[in-house]
């Protein structure tokens, strides 16, 4: 190793440590703010800037290693990776482009809308969105990390806010994740059977659960994809290390730091990407602990992930829906293990052929490359096993199956190794190989039966989303809708608020509210009104008190949905409050015509002849 290269590594490590020290000082400053609310208010901006920094690190690092990686991979592998990315995007079109988690996916998209216009990662309790502008009146910090909304914000900046642009992202990420797995396995210095990388990438794409969730706006496909990118980055760093000294390049360390930190911003358990990176480095060279560039990557990745750590700390008291407050406990293991383990054997979500291939791959690694097997088993154990401890981590319902997507990448690698190993073993027995391949394809195709479907538990909620999509274009400009789900209306370009946010104004200043929104004040009788009796009773009372005017109604199963106008004459008389201040120049057409007619001098009658 030359003196200059050693110096560059020392400078890289010093830079990373300096950034980490600066981040620690910033964290201490935030921790000493006078109130918890002040500390929490830092989160919406700091998380966005943290992800900006991650992208800068990734792009800069990639620029530094593009040439050596290009020489190693060659044109054929690069074109194959491009083909996999396109194939993954197109394959996700087999599933319907809908939302399956109600209404988390709309919250993610609406936060992306907010980031687009304000640069802050907040969901809107009350906002005005008209004429391409967005104005936040009442914000809320979502408990989930903001990686998905951040990526959506870039799509929205380019293509605008729409269902099509929202669903484009996950489809693209599925394809890119497959390409990352292929390139990572091409780069990692593991001994693997020929063709394992390509087989793993294709099997990842056509994993039924990946396709089913790949055409939604759920966070699990991006979470899986960003961990796959981190896997690619660590494989690149391991491949570019000096084989004699085990020292990595600063540029690949920068890429590794940015990719690892960025993966943290998608789900709370995404923090487990750190031990994944460590075990992959160990599996490629047990001298990894001597790699100064890797230590620099760890320091910088920790600094880049700090804003998300602050976010998670700020929502530490959230129940996440756990009725007794226990989010993780060993008491959930038995029940969750039945469903999550059964995923591989009951042929409901996953083909049994895939399980057989994964077992073959694991056995091949056990005999030929145990360190690689340990690394992949660790990845799977963390990505799949963490949900066994989670109170809602079992695949009991269609929506819960999304957690299985997070572990699909390591399972696909095991399957890919299994396919490649069997092909190498049976290629001289084509009849047997063809018969086994046909059986596997039949089983796989049969397991994809649910890919083009929705799911029963989502029907009523999807009907509410469809109802909003149909009604929103009929509302006039300057309207506002009170709804338990303002995010959906805001995404459709309609001003909206949580009911509780404007409740006092509705009951005391209806005239002022109607003055601010001359297009009308509306109440959305939603999916939640059918599920929450207290909310339904309060809204029904308001509709009666205002003699609300029905605008649209629809029924799905036993759920009734509707939109009502509540700024009626009765509402203005009962809840009107103080008259709004008159405009400085009153130029209303009808008023001006009335004044002109009143001021007109009657014409003199014509003289009698």
Q: What is each stretch, according to the model?
A:
Residues 165-190, 229, 233:
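Transmembrane-helix motifs of polytopic, lipid-linked glycan transferases
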Residues 58-69, 177-182, 281-283, 348-377, ...:
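Hydrophobic, aromatic-rich transmembrane alpha-helices
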Residues 181-206, 224-225, 245, 427-437:
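Transmembrane-helix signature of polytopic, membrane-embedded enzymes
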Residues 44, 50, 109, 213-214, ...:
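Hydrophobic/aromatic-rich transmembrane helices and adjacent perimembrane loops
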Residues 268-275, 283, 291-358, 383:
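Membrane-lumen/periplasm interface segments of specific transmembrane helices
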Residues 103, 168-173, 199-229, 234, ...:
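Multi-pass, polyprenyl lipid-linked donor-dependent membrane glycosyltransferases
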Residues 90-91, 270-271, 418, 432-460:
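Transmembrane alpha-helical segments
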Residues 233-245, 249, 272-302, 363-369, ...:
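Perimembrane helix-loop-helix junctions
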């Amino acid at each position: 190793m030359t003196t200059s290269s050693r110096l560059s590594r020392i400078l890289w490590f010093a830079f990373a440590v300096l950034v980490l020290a600066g981040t620690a000082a910033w964290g201490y400053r935030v921790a000493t703010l006078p109130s918890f609310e002040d500390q929490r208010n830092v989160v919406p901006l700091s998380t966005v800037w943290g992800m900006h920094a991650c992208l800068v690190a990734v792009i800069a690092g990639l620029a530094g290693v593009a040439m050596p990686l290009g020489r190693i991979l060659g044109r054929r592998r690069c074109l194959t990776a491009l083909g996999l990315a396109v194939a993954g995007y197109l394959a996700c079109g087999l599933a319907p482009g809908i939302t399956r988690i109600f209404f988390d996916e709309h919250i993610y998209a609406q936060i992306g809308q907010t980031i687009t216009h304000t640069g802050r990662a907040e969901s809107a309790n009350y906002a005005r969105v008209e004429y391409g502008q967005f104005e936040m009146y009442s914000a809320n910090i979502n408990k989930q990390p903001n990686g998905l909304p951040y990526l959506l914000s870039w799509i929205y900046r380019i293509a605008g806010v729409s269902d099509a642009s929202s669903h484009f992202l996950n489809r693209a990420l599925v394809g890119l994740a497959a390409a990352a797995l292929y390139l990572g396995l091409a780069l990692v210095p593991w001994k693997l059977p020929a063709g394992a990388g390509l087989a793993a990438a294709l099997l990842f794409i056509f994993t039924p659960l990946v396709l089913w969730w790949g055409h939604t706006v759920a966070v699990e496909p991006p979470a899986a994809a960003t961990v796959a990118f981190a896997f690619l980055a660590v494989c690149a760093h391991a491949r570019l290390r000096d084989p004699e000294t085990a020292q990595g390049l600063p540029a690949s360390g920068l890429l590794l730091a940015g990719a690892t930190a960025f993966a943290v911003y998608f789900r709370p358990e995404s923090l487990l990407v750190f031990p994944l990176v460590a075990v992959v480095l160990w599996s490629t060279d047990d001298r990894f602990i001597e790699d100064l560039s890797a230590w620099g990557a760890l320091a910088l990745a920790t600094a880049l992930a700090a804003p998300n750590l602050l976010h998670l700390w700020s929502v530490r008291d959230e129940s996440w829906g756990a009725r007794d407050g226990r989010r993780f406990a060993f008491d959930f293991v038995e029940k969750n293990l039945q469903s999550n383990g059964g995923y591989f054997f009951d042929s409901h979500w996953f083909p049994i052929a895939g399980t057989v291939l994964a077992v073959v791959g694991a056995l091949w690694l056990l005999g030929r490359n145990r360190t690689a097997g340990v690394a992949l088993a660790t990845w799977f154990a963390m990505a799949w096993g963490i949900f066994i401890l989670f109170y809602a981590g079992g695949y009991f319902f269609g929506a819960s199956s999304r957690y299985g997507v997070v572990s699909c990448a390591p399972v696909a690698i095991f399957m890919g190794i299994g396919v490649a190993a069997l092909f190498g073993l049976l290629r001289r027995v084509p009849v047997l190989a063809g018969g086994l391949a046909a059986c596997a394809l039949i089983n796989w195709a049969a397991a994809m039966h649910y890919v083009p479907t929705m799911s029963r538990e989502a029907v009523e909620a999807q009907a509410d989303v469809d109802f909003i999509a149909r009604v929103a274009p009929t509302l006039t400009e300057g309207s506002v809708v009170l709804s338990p789900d303002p995010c959906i209306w805001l995404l459709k370009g309609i001003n909206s608020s949580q009911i509780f946010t404007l409740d006092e104004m509705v009951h005391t200043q209806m005239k002022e509210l109607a003055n601010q929104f001359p297009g009308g004040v509306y109440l959305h009788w939603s999916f939640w009104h059918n599920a929450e009796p207290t909310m339904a009773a309060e809204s029904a009372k308001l509709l009666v008190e205002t003699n609300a005017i029905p605008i649209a109604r629809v029924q799905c199963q036993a759920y009734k949905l509707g939109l009502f106008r509540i700024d009626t004459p009765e509402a203005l008389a009962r809840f009107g409050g103080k008259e709004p201040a008159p405009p400085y120049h009153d130029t209303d057409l009808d008023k001006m015509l009335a004044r002109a007619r009143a001021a007109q001098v009657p014409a003199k009658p014509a003289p009698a002849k």
